[in-house]
Structure formats: C-alpha cells, structure tokens
Amino acid sequence: MLFYNKVMDRTAIKQLISRLITHFGITYTTYILDQLKTVGFKQATQAAISLGIDDLLTAPSKSWLIQDAEQQGYISEKHYRYGNVHAVEKLRQLIETWYATSEYLKQEMNPNFRMTDPLNPVHMMSFSGARGSTSQVHQLVGMRGLMSDPQGQIIDLPIQSNFREGLSLTEYIISCYGARKGVVDTAVRTSDAGYLTRRLVEVVQHIVVRKVDCGTSENIFVTPLQNNYKKNNKLIGRILADNIYINGRCIAIRNQDITTNLVISLINFQRKGIFIRSPLICKSMLWICQLCYGWSLTHGNLIELGEAVGIIAGQSIGEPGTQLTLRTFHTGGVFTGDIAEHIRTPFNGIIQFDTNSVYPTRTRHGHPAWICNNNLSVVIKSKKKLHNLVIPTQSLLLVQSNQYVESKQVIAEVRAKTSPFKEKVQKYIYSNLSGEMHWSSKVQHSSEYIHSNVHLLRKTGHIWILAGNFDKDNKFSFIFYQNQDKLDNKLPIAKQTLNYFQLKEHFLNNFWNSIYSSIILYNYRFLEKKNNKYEKKLLFQFMLKLPKNGILKQNDIFAIFNDPKYRIKNSGIIKYGNIKVDLINKKNDIFEDQKTKTVRPRYKILKEGNFFLLPEEVYILDQSSFSSILVKNNSFIKAGTKITFNISSKITGFVKIKKKFNNFKIKILPGSIYYPKEKQKNFKQNGILIPPGEKIFEQFRAKNWIYLEWIVLSKDNSFFLIRPAIEYKIIFNDNPLTLPIPFYLDLLKEQKKIKIQTVKYILYEDSEEVEINPDTDIQLIQTCLILNWETKVFIKEAHISFIKIRINKIIKNFFQINLIENINLMNKKKNNNIILNYLFKKKRYIINQKDCEKILLLSKTWGIIRTPSNKNQEKSFFLILSPFNLFQTILFDKTKQNLKIENNVEKLFTYEPKKIIKTFNIEKRKNFVEFLGLLGYLQNITKSFQLFSCKKFSDKSIPINFSIIDNLKKKIKISKWFFLNENKKVQKFFLTQNTILSLLNWSFPIFDLAKKKTQLFNLGHFFCDGLSIAEYPTFSESGQIIAIYDDLSLVIRLAKPYLATGGAIIHNNYGEIVKEGDILITLIYERLKSGDIIQGLPKVEQLLEARLTNPVSINLEKGFGEWNKDMTNFFGSLWGYFLSAQISMEQSQVNLVNQIQKVYRSQGVNISDKHIEIIVRQMTSKVFTLEDGMTNGFLPGELIEFARAKRMNRALEEVIPYKPVLLGITKASLNTQSFISEASFQETTRVLAKAALRGRIDWLKGLKENVILGGIIPTGTGCEEVLWQITLEKQKNILLKKNKSKLFHNKVKDIFLYKKLSISFTSEKIHKNY
C-alpha cells in the first residue's frame, strides 16, 4: 500500500478508493472510508469553518489587469473609428482581451489565497473540490466577465465587478439575461436528460448477461497510447480476443481480462495494437455474454451472470446529460482555434525570408500578416549567431522580412493538421448617423437579389456615410430648392398641392423601379431629311430609352425594337447555330426586363446566321403538391395524360421530374425514342443539331431540324431522344440611319453627320433554359439603335429634344438630336470675362381656391440642400447640410469653427388665391465652367461642380413695390474658389464681386492663375480621423473635403467610415439616403463550432437518434486511407462486396461510439465505452430485406434482426438478401420483439392494432413487459432463469469435456489401427515382390 503525503483533493480520493477496492475489496474499503469520514468531521468541528463576506478577498492585481484591458479596448475602438478594422475584428479583439484578462485573474486567485490566507474558507472549500468550482469563486472574488445576449452573441461590454464588490445598474441589467438563462437551461437540460435516459433504457432494457462465452471469432482493434492514462484506462477490464506475443513469447492468452499491469507491459514493449472483445461483436441475439462485456465497474472483476447491464448502460449515458452545456463559441476567423503552435525567436536579431513565397492577408484581429504557400526557410541573424528554421506550409507570418525581432517574440503561427469545425455567421452593421452612402471599392449587383438594392463587395474597402439631416416627410411633390441651394431657417422647403389641374404630356413618367432610370416613349418614327422632304425609313414601333437630362454619349443605346417574330410563348432551351456572338459584357450589354423584373445580360450578334429553340413543357409544383403527381420520372407519356388532377399534358414526350429548392419542376420533352444497335458508334451524335434532309443513324431522313439527346437511365437502359428544334434566322441590314446637324448650330465649321447604327442582341446564352410563366411571352432578340458620330469630332455628348409639329390640325411628335459643344475656358485668351445670361420667363396660372390646397414644409435649421446622387430615388428625397454636419479647418491654425455660408441667393415665390402667381425661374443659356465649390454628384467629381451662389431666389412673397436689384445687392457675396485641371492640381483663381447693373446680365471677371500649386488636398478627398499631413494639424474628425478657400482653409463634410471585407453585403445603393439605425452592411465571417452547430446534450441526442449531421464524411481523407488497405484485398472477389459492406458497418459502429465519447469528454464527463457500445449494438441490430421472399415469409423493406437473418440464411436453400441499417433509439424501441414494450413507449394505439392484425406473440423476454404484467423480472443473480442457465452451462461444459476425451481416445485408436494396417500392407507387398 502506498503512503500518501499530499493534499487529498477529489482526484486523489478517487484514486485512493480505487486502489483500496482492488487490494482489499469493498467490505474493508468501506471500513477505511468510514474512518476517513470520522476524521474529517472531527477536524471540521475543531476548525469551525464558516463563510462570511470578509472571507472573499479580491486579488490585488485586478486593478492593473482591468486597466490594461481597457487600454487595449481603447486602441481597438480607435482603429475601428479610423476604419482600420471592421466590427467583427473589433469584437474578436475585445472578447479575447477580456477573456484572457478573466482567465489570468482566475489563475491569480489560488496563489493569492496561499500567500495571504492559506486557511481561508473559500480557498479550502473550492480548491479542495468539496464545494464550489473555480469559476464560481472567480465570480465572487474576481470578475463576472463576458455575458451573452438573447441571440446568443457575446456582449462586448464585460462585467468588471464581482459579487463581493457589487454590480452597477448597467452590469446588473447585462447579467440578468445570462443568469436567468442559466436557471432555465438547467431545468431544460434536466428534463431533456430524463427523457434521453428513458429512451436509452427503453432500447436496452432486455439486455442481461446470460452466457459466459458466445464463441464469437470477431474482434476490435485498439492501440495503447504512451503516457495517456485516461485513454488507456478504458482498456482495463476488457477481455482479449486473441493471444498476445512479444518476441515469440506469449504474455497473454485469449479470453484473459486486461489488468493495469498488462497495460503497462504493453506500453513498455511498445505494442502497436491488440484485439479485444466488445458488446458490438457478441453473437447472442437477445442477451450478452460475460466475456464480451468484461469487468463490472462496481466490483472490479468479471461481471456476474444475471446482471441487467442494459439498464446500467442507459442510465450511465443519460445521467451525465445534466452536466453537458448548450454553449457556442463566438470567436473565429483566420486560423482561430486551428493554431497548433507558435514559433518564437531564440534571440534578438534580424529575420530574413523569401518575400515571393508569401502573400498578404489579415489576421483575425485585422492586423497585417502573410501566408506561406510552401515550407518557408527563415534565417535569424545577429552579430554573433545565426539560426535557421523552417516554417510549415499555410502558416501565418506575423513579421516582415529584414525586420528586427526580439527574443521569444512570436513570429509565426502554425496551422493545425486537422481543421476545426466552423460555421458561417452574419453580423449586421448599423449606421451611427443619418446621411448619404458612398463607396469607392468595386461593388457588384448581387445576382440573388436582382430587383433590390443588395450589392456584394468584391474586395475589402470602406463604406462612407456622409452626414446630413434627413427629413422623414418625403411626400411633397414639389421642392422649391435645387441641389446646392442655400437655405434659411423657417423658410418653406417643399410644397404639396392637392386637387389641382395639371398639363398632361404625351409621354410616360419615369420608371422608378428601373435600375437605369429613363424616360420611355412610344409610337415615334425616325425620319431622314433628303431633298427637303421627309421620308419614312423605319416603320416599326420603337421604344425610346433616354436619360432624364436628355444627354447621350457616343455609342449609347437610345431606342429598342422587339421584333414579334422573335417572341416566344413556350419554354425551352436555346441552342446557337452558326451565329457569331460577343460574350464579353460591355456598357450596353445589361438591360432590365420589365415583365420579369430582372436584370439580364445581352450579347451582341457579330455575324448573321441562325439559332434554335428546343421546346419544352414545364410545370412547377410546390412541395405540398408532390403527392398529387400522377406521372413517373423518366417515363414517356402521350398528349392528354393527366400530370396532376388539374393539369394535363399538351404534348407527347419524355417526363423529367427534378426538385428545385422547395418546389418540384416537371418537364415534358417532346420527341420520339430510338434505341440504337451500336451504342458506342452512335454516342458521338449526342447533342448535335441535324438539318432537314440529312440521314439519321444511316436509316432515316429528317424532315425538319431535330436535336439528338442521349439519355441514360441505367447501365442497360439508354436511348436517343429525337427532339424537334425551331429555327430562327438573323439577317443584318447594313444601312445606318444618318441625320444631318441643323446648319444654325455650327455655321463656321464643316458639317458633321450623326449616324444611327442598328445592332442586334440575343438575350440568352447557348444551352440556357428559358422558363415562361403561363399567359406570358419572352423576347429572344432585340434590335437596338446606337447613336454615333465621327471620331474626329471632339464632342462627347449629344442632346435629344422633343418637338410637337402641327400639320393639318394633327399634332405629331418628333425628336431632334444636337451635338453639344463644351465650353473651354483656356481657349478664350482675348476676353477674360465669361458672361452668364439668365432669362426670366413669366408664367400665368389661374387657380381656383376651392380646388387647391397647399401644404408647406418649413425648415428647422439653415444649411444647404443636398440632392442624393442616386438616380433611382425620387426627387422628393433630400438632405440639408447644416453647420452641425460641416466644419471648417484652417490649415495654419488648429482651431475649428462652424462653416458660415455667405452665398445666399434666394428664389422668389408668391401665392395669392384667385390672383396671378408670379414665379421667377432662373435658367442658364449655356453651361458654365465647373467650379471647385460644394460637391454635387459624386460619381464624376470633376464634372459636377456648380456655382451654387447664382441659382435661385429665396421663397418669399413679392410686394408691389419690390425691387429685384436691391435684393440682389444685399444678398449676393462672391467668394474665392479654385479650379481643377486634368492633373487634379489645385490652382487658385480670384472671383470678385461685380455691381449688378442689368437684370439680365451678370459678369464675373477672372484674373490670372496663382503661382502656388499643391497636391496635398484634393476636392472630394476622404480622410479618416487622426490623419496628419506634413506641417498641417491633425484632422480631428473623419470626413470629405467639399470646398477649399484661398485662405488655406478647408470645408469638411463630416463622414463615418465603415470597413467591410470582400463578400460583404451592402444593403443600399450608391448615393442613397440612410437614416440613423438603418442596416448598412452584412459581414460574413466564420465562427468556431464544437463539431457541429448543435452541441452538448442536443448533439448526443442527434447522434443517438441517427439524424443526418453532415452530407459528407468529416474524416473522409483519413477514412479512405485506412479502408483502402482492406478494400484492395476484396476487389475482384465475389465476396468482396459483402465483406466491404460488413467492414463499413463495423467502422460506422466504432465511429459512432467515438463521436458520442467526444461530446462527453469535451465537457469533462467520463463514460465507459462498453455502455455506449451496448446502445450502438441495438441501433445496428436490424437489417432491411431487399426482395420479396415467398419462401421465407418476409416482405421487402421489413426490419428483421441481423442474427435472425444470418441464421435463416444458413438454414434455407434460398438466401435472404438484406442490407444493414442504422436506427435511432426511438425507432429501435418501436421495432422490438415485444409489442407490449413498444406500446408502453409510444404510439400505443397503432402498435397494439398492428400487433393484433399480424397476430404477434410476446414471449416476455425483457424486463419491462414482465413489470407491466406483474411477473418476476428475468434478471438478478438469483433469478430462476439465470440459475437454470448456469446449470445448463455447467452440464454443457461437462458434456463437452467428455466428448473431447472420447474424440481424443478414438483418434488415438484410429492412429494405431492405421499404423497396423499400413505395416501389414507393406509386408504383403514386399512378400509378393520377392
């Protein structure tokens, strides 16, 4: 007996009790433990241990640990504000920082108690294992730590206080959900564990040890592990299935139990593996034998006959269910959890490696790192030392080449060999301010959300929200102010007029749901002027597709013609013939289908030819209608056949049924079936189009175009489906429409011609399926008109205007195309003045007071109107840029002040009932040069600057003695602005105020350019908070530069950057207005999971119920390597297929046991393998019959016992074909030999009715049915059946010994007789020869 001289905690007590039982037995062990209990009570009484609040001592290191964690959190928040990390990376940093702080504080508790107060009651109770755990004490004297929200996500605000210090109100509210969830989870887990125990006991309640040896020859191979006591402990108490030989010497024989000494010997001799017996391989049908079960865990010796090991196994697995948790790990990302080890530097030095062998990436915390493709050689150099090391492939490098590293610094993280289980999780990012969305990265429209504002981010980039006050009331039909207008406080912004008369135009309004907003007009004819006469060139009906501003660029599509002969009403497949198609999508190759409301690509036809449509009949049914389908898949039906009760086939053809998402798609392919004689020779004709008159299979001639499709149903059933094909021809017309430019537009230059080219587009790819809804049609070919002109002309835009001409009292609509000349400021060298001419037009409207109601929206603050740059939105959406959204930065001074906008030009507006309303509208006669003022549309910064100080008048009523000139003199103040040249360098200009002498003429003199140029600040440039440039002060806010003044001050529009990774989903369009709290981005990231999304008790239940967890095997590569060794021996053998099925079933049993053990061991629960093996044995004890056996009486698909099937196959002449099946514990409980047990479990009425109809007999073999009927349960060492079984076993052994002795005696007699006969035979033969 060993002498213990140490602290006896829970683990030490367990080891002591185990050794006492092994050496002295249970009786003496009970006496010794009773003495230990008495000593413990005596010492506890003398110590008088009590627990008070003063015994809760907080570790002194807590304050600086929390301070350090807060500093790390502040740094993370700063990087997030700068846009360097996104929300998920920030959350990971906070979680791991506070988790590490909490764990370090937990480790500091025990040393602190030992040094300050070793006899502290809290310390003695918790760390001895008597009461309480380390985690519970940590919440009393350490910190509460991180908590989860109702969605299961971890809250990034930890509870820094403990229960000794007391929680604040915020901390208490945060902890409420987690605390209540713990109570609820405990109750739920208790009930779930109870029900799981009931199901487990139900499936194995009849398993009793009845025999000593079942005589099985099968075994299970296990490997003893070095220095792993827990895994080797499961070998102790098992029975050997084969002899063990070490160097030719037998150290253990078959049917010998494995003891601790034998395991130690196997480890010392480095035995690779041994064969043991298991309940999985026991040959007994209803019971189990002693040798397959092994030792009793209670007594430490061989299990006795009559023990109800099934009940023990069920309770052993179900009882620890309350200890399992339901938590999910909330960290993840690049290499999270799959880091095998860290590589550290041995000394200070400079690290060097090949930079071409690595590529950059981001760590899970957003820090820069590099991944090596192959094994990377790294050299660390110092003045006196040189160290070489190899970093494995796919490892993460945390340093750069030629960087100085310190001793013990982590330079790389090595990836684990087995990747952990992860799941993809979405995290929503919400806007912190109202404003306008902007992005600069490449964003593509999501194909899954064609008709929405969902976009996908191709690569990592920033999403900006430009600040602005959002007006929630957007129902106003008319806005007084235009983009960039200055707005005073309490002035009307917009007006809504109800019940008034308005002019009706001859064209439709904008389609706001279109991605490319446009004006669509119908019934226009294109005319060409020849000899002063108009001749009609195009008589078709074109649909004009024009921008809002009426400006077209070169090669723009402005009209579309849908030819009726290319319009189809039946579904089918498109097949290209000899047409040549440009498959590269360009600017004009995307359009929106108004009928299907989807955006599709279109492909330009380069060469005329033909294409084909393979017609099909398609029906889509929901999942609930699957039972009403009356036709079979891969069948051939005639026209008029009922497909469902309400649908009949219109054509004769081949039926294909496929499941598409949650619906079923039924396709009927018209045609005829042909079975070729030579399949290999005719297989080359698969998928080809055959013209009329050509031979098919050297037997028939085609009358029309046909398509051959090879269909394979099985190995021996394949044929050709001859399908009809509809031909469509494409013919080009190479006569472009030419329109001359009116002479008055360009008198001095040579006349230039505008060309309208006709281009045909096909809307579907080759082999693409076309599905058409009932009562609809789809266009296949579009004819488009493209505007073009001579390339020598330096004109980039053309303007389209509409004209109404009255001819003989009939008004007809025409349109005119004019080329637009851009104003070039630098070409006017002689004249330094640019004159802007504005025309005031008077309009008279007489409005009846009874029919008109006016609603005005008043401004709450003064600022600047900002129209969003997204053209998909209606005009009534607008932002007001107030001084709270702008700030001015003086580059020489670090002070910050609000922007004072002096450019105040207002619009005139008056309203008087039953009188003339006078409105003065300002219109530009020509485009003005682009100023570097406040930004307009952000898509094209250099072409969107306007002089907003001269646009509108303020909305005020006009008095009778009103003077416009006096008002203008008071309001207008012209500032000094900048221009941008092509190189985007800032150039200073001076704009001075000019006295207004004429109402129709303003002039602004422009002086020479300034000499100073700089490239430090560009208009429209985005920058983050904390940016510092050269000698200028640091920017204190993130934003966008929207104006630059001559005093070197910047006007900055406040903005908020959000970092998003590639693959993120953006929920708004470019330039769209978003409100505070709206969803901006959905980040997709990976999160660790423990084997599966379901964990703990639900995971165990999922495995025991045999539910599908993964469609593909997790350890596919490893399993294939192991099984391949055995499979190679079976290929080419008739029995190989049967043996492979048996091996796969045995391997599945072992894998299922390991998976269940993995869940329990991850939670610190140890269960003997033999208990789980008994459950798995019952789950795999049934097989499915495959064929209808008239002689054996089994139906196809019937569940029978595996042992019964093997026994009948040995007895019957005709074998029963069957396949193995894995049943869940619930289904296995409902498929037993006792219908009484099944009825008492579930579905009582169904089970009893089925048993009555089949005439089943219950032989009362199990425990449950005997309890129900009040009989004696057939278990226990004193049971009559067990005693009779023991007597029968003894008599059987005696009989076997007698038979063996008789057999040996008869064999000896036979040997002597054979020897005597052989001697006499040889002597006679020799005598004859002589």
From Swiss-Prot:
Organism of this sequence: Physcomitrium patens
* Gene transcribed to yield this protein: rpoC2
One GO BP: DNA-templated transcription
Q: Which InterPro entries match?
A: DNA-dir_RpoC2_beta_pp, RNA_pol_beta''_euk, RNA_pol_Rpb1_3_sf, RNA_pol_Rpb1_4, RNA_pol_Rpb1_5, Rpb1_funnel_sf
Tell me what this protein is called: DNA-directed RNA polymerase subunit beta''
Highest taxon in the source lineage: Eukaryota
| Reaction(s) the record says it catalyses | RNA(n) + a ribonucleoside 5'-triphosphate = RNA(n+1) + diphosphate
Query: Which molecular-function annotation in GO is an example for this chain?
Result: DNA binding
Its quaternary organisation is: In plastids the minimal PEP RNA polymerase catalytic core is composed of four subunits: alpha, beta, beta', and beta''. When a (nuclear-encoded) sigma factor is associated with the core the holoenzyme is formed, which can initiate transcription.
Q: Which NCBIfam families match?
A: rpoC2_cyan (TIGR02388)
